[in-house]
Amino acid sequence: MNPLIPAASVIAAGLAVGLASIGPGVGQGTAAGQAVEGIARQPEAEGKIRGTLLLSLAFMEALTIYGLVVALALLFANPFV
């Protein structure tokens, strides 16, 4: 077995987790900031805004979890070996 394949898999796993968390991290920060701004403008809509925010944060976090699954597959169930 070529020793370059496991080394490349470790690097690819790190990149998968790192790059998969950049987009959702920025999106979650923006969404939370806009939710706070919306609640400050209309305090009576707090419940509706908060519920929508939590649902959208869950969908954004799913993208990071997909990256983690890909990284774990590269590390422990390496398809290239």
From Swiss-Prot:
TM regions (residue ranges): 3-23, 57-77
Pfam family, one: ATP-synt_C
Main location as per UniProt: plastid
Family membership: Belongs to the ATPase C chain family.
Subunit architecture: F-type ATPases have 2 components, F(1) - the catalytic core - and F(0) - the membrane proton channel. F(1) has five subunits: alpha(3), beta(3), gamma(1), delta(1), epsilon(1). F(0) has four main subunits: a(1), b(1), b'(1) and c(10-14). The alpha and beta chains form an alternating ring which encloses part of the gamma chain. F(1) is attached to F(0) by a central stalk formed by the gamma and epsilon chains, while a peripheral stalk is formed by the delta, b and b' chains.
Protein name according to UniProt: ATP synthase subunit c, chloroplastic
Residues forming coiled coils: none
Entry annotated with the keyword Cytoplasm: no
Cellular component GO terms held in the UniProt record: chloroplast thylakoid membrane; proton-transporting ATP synthase complex; proton-transporting two-sector ATPase complex, proton-transporting domain
Organism of provenance: Cycas taitungensis
InterPro entries in alphabetical order: ATP_synth_csu_bac/chlpt, ATP_synth_F0_csu, ATP_synth_F0_csu_DDCD_BS, ATP_synth_F0_csu_sf, ATPase_proteolipid_c-like_dom, F/V-ATP_Csub_sf
Keywords: ATP synthesis, CF(0), Chloroplast, Hydrogen ion transport, Ion transport, Lipid-binding, Membrane, Plastid, Thylakoid, Transmembrane, Transmembrane helix, Transport
Annotated site location: Reversibly protonated during proton transport: 61
Note: In plastids the F-type ATPase is also known as CF(1)CF(0).
